[in-house]
């Protein structure tokens, strides 16, 4: 399939498209003429650029016909929304792992995430919590280690042998 050039849709054109999608004002019927020919008969509305068309066929299947640049735009917006959600989940999971400096950990994680970008330009769908835990294992200096921070050596009387009580007499 030929890759279509990316074209931006102007605001007025996108408003017309949205209006045609919500009102379903352009309706057509698709008739089979022969094995290789179909007839598209407009029932309502008009054929205009940058508008959607709702098509029904003889088997009562419904289709929506939209300009190719709109499909490209929808795909790009879906990709951006997926990446924004992935970054938001990543930030949420970074916070749960007690970073010393959130911004540092976020930068490291975003760089590592970019390294996972696929050949088609998309980011893979990953488990962000496991991803952050792996970063924590590889870069423990970026996170607080509460286990070591609150551990106290076990009580042992030998630890206090060198304790000098002479200061008590001065009080």
Swiss-Prot record:
InterPro entries: UPF0763. It comes from the Bacteria. Pfam families: DUF2603 (PF10788). Belongs to the UPF0763 family. This is UPF0763 protein HPSH_03535. It comes from Helicobacter pylori (strain Shi470).
